[in-house]
A protein has these predicted regions:
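Conserved AdoMet/S-adenosylmethionine-binding subsite of the radical SAM
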Residues: 1-100
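C-terminal accessory extensions appended to soluble enzyme cores
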Residues: 78-83, 89-143
């Protein structure tokens, strides 16, 4: 069993992760689990494209690894936002004013995702940022 924690920048969490624990509360929980000897995965997924996303995600990575002992981490996952066309249709009906559901995504095999140029830019940026703290062989991508 691997205990996984999804972590987002504070701005993204405040806007889109209603009723979820704050990002730094998740980091504290991850720390406690690691201190208890449990394998922990940090998930920087789904990455949300927003104003100053580079700054938001860069600060988040620095904040996370100022508190987490990377040598105790099992691994790290990275992935940009993607969603099934059926679920996005439901979300658009339920939350018509949300910027996330109104983005002009590409539909690839029934799943909406950011256009390739945005997606690859975000994911490559995060791999680079996280690899300053974690060996690349412990970083994997969700596709």
């Amino acid at each position: 069993v691997i205990i996984a924690y999804t972590v987002s920048p504070q701005r993204v969490a405040a806007e889109y992760e209603h009723f979820a624990s704050a990002p730094m509360e998740r980091i504290q929980a991850a720390k406690c689990a690691m201190d208890g000897g449990f394998p922990v995965r940090l998930c920087f997924d789904p990455m949300i494209y927003c104003k100053d996303w580079r700054g938001e995600y860069s600060r988040m990575v620095d904040d996370v690894f100022s508190q987490i002992d990377d040598s105790k981490l099992w691994d790290v996952s990275i992935g940009s936002f993607r969603i099934s066309q059926d679920y996005l249709k439901k979300m658009r009906k339920d939350m018509p004013r949300s910027a996330v559901v109104n983005f002009p995504y590409d539909n690839v095999n029934g799943y909406y995702q950011y256009p390739e140029n945005i997606r690859s830019d975000m994911e490559e940026f995060m791999i680079q940022a996280v690899s300053e703290y974690v060996d690349k062989d412990r970083i994997f991508m969700w596709k």
